């Protein structure tokens, strides 16, 4: 029978529930269990697709085209699985589904209420995640903090699940904070005690408490927490700030967290073999070289907006025993006069995805700098579109060339709406989303990176390269190295007379893994290292 683990949070948000859940998933997978994982977000948006990155951070896209929480990126990178649309559920999705059922008459005229209709819908999403993947274990992270009004239906639903399927099949893990008061020179357990008290008042008794802390947690403190929170002392797990996220699974294993979980759920599996993971962490901790990459973006104040990009750069660096330092460059501040000052000390330039016109001209200046100075360049989504526009303006001489998204009146719409997007009015969930094939041309940097004729990558865009400009740009040295199999859509572009200048319409960062870097990022970092060594 499928087992269910629920991860909740208390005291404050941003405690690392997602990393804890992902780390536990890695440990259980390495015990030979089929693990899937999901995130419940209590906001009323149907998904984060139309939310500002300042509000929510990165939007992570799954193979099947779901726009989801950035925690799913952590889940995929840690557990090395591809998640789906059932892996991220919001209050908006739940209520939308229930209201549609009510309109269809599925409740037979009954009064639709939070209990049982909303809670039943939540439970069905939990069970469905396990069914769709035939999982041995489903890990569900509940977003928000215990005590929030928004989380109550989710907490009630996961309380009911234990009654529905039995205590041996359900486990609750609660993540809290033990603050350190510098003035007093001591740590305080009271916030954790009150958080657990709040959780128990809702009918949920945690089986494990994971305490986030800056300082070591003494045995006396663990005993105190165990007494007041009514759990075993061994089930108080310390989550210290780590030098690398990838060390967290090893820390949890040292404290036997995965064994406690297996004992409670009556899972008789051998201990997790973490030899390869340990070697990865040792490599990360002992990188001997450095390279610096300029990330020119519009959301650089909130680095979570580009978290998968940064992780993909790091993964690529691991392959070359290199620590990739990201230099954050606000695109709004970049001009032709200061671009040398802002990116001249870097070994490579990356322009990530985005929407809207803010910062666009600064990105184009940075792209021109990379092209003219032979600096390795990687463009992603909007970065690919702007690389095309920069070439049209400054090589072909098409003054005013632009994207119709940025300037609907441009005389040269190098980037235009996809034909199937012309009549779309809704913003949410209507982009070209998910996994699509890309056919590569031989003897190109893109083909050399992948070494395969056809690859599959995840997309999130509404605009596309305008094919009427392809002949002129090809004549000028612009290479269309990747297209859709029918040749209609441009997927990858590069430059003929440049050491490494590649840009993709898709989001390669989404499929990178710490032990298996994404090919374009791998070769981009290699080119950046070569550039540094040649200076």
Swiss-Prot record:
Residues reported to bind UTP: 13, 188-193, 224
Binding, CTP: 13, 148-150, 188-193, 224
Keyword Magnesium listed: yes
Superkingdom, natural source: Bacteria
Organism ancestry: Bacteria, Bacillati, Bacillota, Bacilli, Bacillales
Amino-acid positions noted as binding L-glutamine in the UniProt annotation, renumbered to this chain: 54, 354, 382-385, 405, 462
Protein family per UniProt: Belongs to the CTP synthase family.
Other known facts: CTPSs have evolved a hybrid strategy for distinguishing between UTP and CTP. The overlapping regions of the product feedback inhibitory and substrate sites recognize a common feature in both compounds, the triphosphate moiety. To differentiate isosteric substrate and product pyrimidine rings, an additional pocket far from the expected kinase/ligase catalytic site, specifically recognizes the cytosine and ribose portions of the product inhibitor.
Keywords, sorted A to Z: ATP-binding, Glutamine amidotransferase, Ligase, Magnesium, Metal-binding, Nucleotide-binding, Pyrimidine biosynthesis
Activity regulation info: Allosterically activated by GTP, when glutamine is the substrate; GTP has no effect on the reaction when ammonia is the substrate. The allosteric effector GTP functions by stabilizing the protein conformation that binds the tetrahedral intermediate(s) formed during glutamine hydrolysis. Inhibited by the product CTP, via allosteric rather than competitive inhibition.
Active site: 381, 507, 509
Keyword Cytoplasm (UniProt): no
Residues binding Mg(2+): 71, 141
MF GO annotations: ATP binding; CTP synthase activity; glutaminase activity; identical protein binding; metal ion binding
The enzyme's E.C. designation: 6.3.4.2
InterPro entries documented for this protein: Class_I_gatase-like, CTP_synthase, CTP_synthase_N, GATASE, GATase1_CTP_Synthase, P-loop_NTPase
Name the record gives this protein: CTP synthase
GO terms of biological process kind: 'de novo' CTP biosynthetic process; pyrimidine nucleobase biosynthetic process
Cited Pfam families: CTP_synth_N, GATase
Positions that bind ATP: 14-19, 71, 240-242
